[in-house]
């Protein structure tokens, strides 16, 4: 009896995209406080508030993103949200005020919430049911690998540049 094929191109793409998403998330996480303090002279309370905006936005969008993914086409929603997620990184550099930075942080959190729900949904769709648990394990492993290398890389980049 042969196993259903799990390592399809679609699975490899979503796995790589998931790794890169979380790598970017963990890359910037440890250095945002430094950036806000250095560029905007933000205090600890303001930094905490700004960093929290992202997570709160991601939490708020998740139930709605689930509904949208069940109602509309999943792949385009995933790609648009992923594009927004990537584009916001450039917005951070261009932000000239804390208000704009907060707005970007909220949009970034919304896109992250949508991308993560969409990615989870898509990976379940493309995995054969007989290998779904194994595939989701590998999919989650991409997050852990990103968590292992992202902060270290971000802090290294901050110290060098």
Language model feature labels by segment:
Residues 7-47:
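Helix-loop boundary and gating motifs at the non-cytosolic
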Residues 22, 51-54, 139-147:
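Structural signature of transmembrane alpha-helices in multi-pass secondary transporters
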Residues 41, 73, 94-99:
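Helix-breaking motifs and short loop linkers at transmembrane-helix boundaries and internal kinks
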Residues 61-73:
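Helix-to-loop junctions at the C-terminal end of transmembrane segments
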Residues 106-141:
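Cytoplasmic helix-loop-helix junction between adjacent transmembrane helices
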Residues 55-63, 147-148:
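Residue-level signature of mid-helix packing/kink "hotspots" within the transmembrane helices
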Residues 99-107:
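Paired small-residue
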Residues 76-90:
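Structural signature of the two symmetry-related core transmembrane helices
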């Amino acid at each position: 009896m042969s196993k259903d094929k799990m390592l399809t191109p679609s699975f490899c793409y979503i796995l790589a995209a998931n790794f890169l998403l979380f790598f970017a998330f963990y890359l910037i996480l440890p250095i945002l406080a430094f950036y806000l303090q250095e560029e905007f002279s933000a205090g600890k309370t303001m930094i905490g508030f700004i960093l929290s905006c992202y997570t709160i936005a991601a939490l708020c969008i998740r139930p709605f993103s689930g509904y949208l993914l069940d109602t509309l086409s999943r792949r385009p929603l995933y790609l648009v949200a992923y594009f927004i997620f990537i584009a916001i990184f450039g917005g951070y550099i261009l932000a000239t005020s804390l208000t704009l930075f907060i707005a970007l942080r909220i949009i970034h959190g919304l896109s992250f919430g949508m991308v993560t729900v969409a990615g989870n949904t898509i990976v379940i769709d493309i995995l054969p049911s007989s290998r779904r648990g194994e595939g989701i394990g590998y999919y989650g492993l991409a997050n852990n690998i990103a968590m292992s290398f992202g902060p270290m890389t971000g802090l290294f980049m901050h110290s060098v540049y």
